[in-house]
């Protein structure tokens, strides 16, 4: 192997030959004149080597780059050979956002797939198709969801919307009744089923509700009013009767629920019936928390379980119990303590 040959020092002897048998050139060329007198752009360039020493060349460190990273200081070409230049070019392309080489997995995914055979296609189609158990479970789940939504809507209708509608209807009926009284329109001695003729006040419960003839659910109770027992077999007295029991029915839950809290009444609490001409003031006397719906004796002129001992002017309030059911009935009784003409103003129970 040929060893590295040291370069001859350039001197003044311009007639001496190079180590390769070539004469030194003129002043300013490599080997002719002084090396310091070479071109300014080539002052840092390493000495050229012949082809025989390329394999043994010691790689030179890369030339320092400028701030922009585009070349060596001094504006000269990149050093380090073609391999270094290729690496520098790759680095520059990477900094400029060139796409990276795709991973083998991505290349495999992008590679075209071979078409499936008919058997494989049918097998995949059967695998994607849900089984009978899955279809049945989905159908049952949809049925349960639909049933739950319908039940929620029904509960919302019963507990909220029926009250909203019944309150509006009852308020309108009370307003119409008061307008008729203010205009001097006289009420007949008897009333049609569903016709309002009085107002019921329960101050402790903040209840003011129209009283209509009959206990029809459609015409009276479901419209937020309370009904007067006036049908044959359950006919009760009117408030202006000299003796008798004035029987009323009302909802405890839903449809305005005017009697929802009558279980909170205590003996002595006032119950007032307002008509076109008079106020009839009753005092709560007793309560029967639970009784059968068929116990119609609670509407007798002198109810046996009320504690009254003889004929008098009584009032009976009936409603369902427990709440949200109609299995039993709750009964509240009261006794009249004052009959006051409207010309004398409101009774104390409505003023205080």
UniProtKB/Swiss-Prot annotation:
Keywords: Cell membrane, Hydrolase, Membrane, Protease, Transmembrane, Transmembrane helix
Region of interest (Disordered), ranges: 1-132
Catalytic activity, reaction form: The enzyme catalyzes a cell wall sorting reaction in which a surface protein with a sorting signal containing a LPXTG motif is cleaved between the Thr and Gly residue. The resulting threonine carboxyl end of the protein is covalently attached to a pentaglycine cross-bridge of peptidoglycan
Residues on Cytoplasmic side: 1-139
The protein's role, per its UniProt record: Transpeptidase that anchors surface proteins to the cell wall. Recognizes both Leu-Ala-x-Thr-Gly and Leu-Pro-x-Thr-Gly, with a preference for the former. Unlike the S.aureus sortase it cleaves not only the Thr-Gly motif but also the Ala-X bond; Ala-Glu and Ala-His bonds are better substrates than the Thr-Gly motif in vitro. Among its possible substrates are the chaplins ChpA, ChpB and ChpC; this enzyme is less important for ChpC attachment than is SrtE2.
Entry similarity comment: Belongs to the bacterial sortase family. Class E subfamily.
Name of this protein: Sortase SrtE1
Origin species: Streptomyces coelicolor (strain ATCC BAA-471 / A3(2) / M145)
Lineage, broadest ranks: Bacteria, Bacillati, Actinomycetota, Actinomycetes, Kitasatosporales
Encoding gene, per UniProt annotation: srtE1
């Amino acid at each position: 192997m040929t060893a590295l040959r040291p370069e001859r020092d350039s001197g003044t002897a311009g007639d001496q030959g190079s180590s390769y048998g070539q004469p030194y050139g003129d002043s300013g060329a490599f080997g002719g004149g002084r090396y310091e007198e070479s071109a300014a752009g080539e002052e840092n360039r390493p000495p050229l080597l012949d082809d025989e020493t390329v394999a043994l060349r010691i790689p030179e460190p890369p030339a320092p780059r400028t701030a922009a990273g585009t070349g060596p200081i001094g504006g000269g070409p990149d050093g380090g050979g073609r391999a270094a230049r290729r690496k520098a070019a790759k680095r520059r392309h990477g900094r400029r956002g060139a796409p990276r080489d795709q991973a083998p997995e991505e290349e495999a995914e992008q590679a075209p797939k071979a078409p499936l055979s008919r058997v494989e296609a049918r097998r995949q189609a059967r695998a994607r198709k849900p089984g009978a158990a899955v279809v049945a479970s989905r159908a049952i789940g949809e049925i349960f969801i639909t049933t739950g939504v319908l039940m929620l809507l029904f509960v919302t209708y019963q507990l909220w919307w029926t009250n909203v509608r019944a309150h509006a209807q009852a308020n309108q009926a009370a307003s119409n009744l008061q307008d008729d009284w203010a205009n001097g329109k006289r009420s007949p001695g008897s009333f049609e089923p569903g016709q309002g003729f009085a107002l019921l006040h329960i101050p402790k419960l903040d209840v003011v509700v129209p009283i209509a003839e009959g206990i029809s659910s459609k015409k009276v109770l479901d419209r937020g009013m309370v009904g007067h027992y006036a049908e044959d077999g359950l006919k009760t007295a009117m408030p202006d009767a000299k003796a008798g029991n004035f029987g009323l029915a009302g909802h405890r839950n839903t449809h305005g629920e005017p009697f929802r809290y009558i279980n909170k009444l205590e003996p002595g609490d006032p119950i007032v019936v307002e008509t076109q001409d008079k106020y009839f003031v009753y005092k709560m006397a007793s309560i029967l928390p639970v009784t059968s719906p068929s116990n119609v004796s609670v509407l007798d002129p002198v109810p046996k379980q009320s504690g009254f001992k003889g004929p008098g002017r009584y009032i009976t309030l009936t409603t369902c119990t427990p709440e949200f059911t109609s299995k039993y009935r709750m009964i509240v009784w009261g006794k009249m303590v004052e009959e006051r003409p409207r010309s004398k103003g409101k009774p104390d129970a409505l003023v205080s």
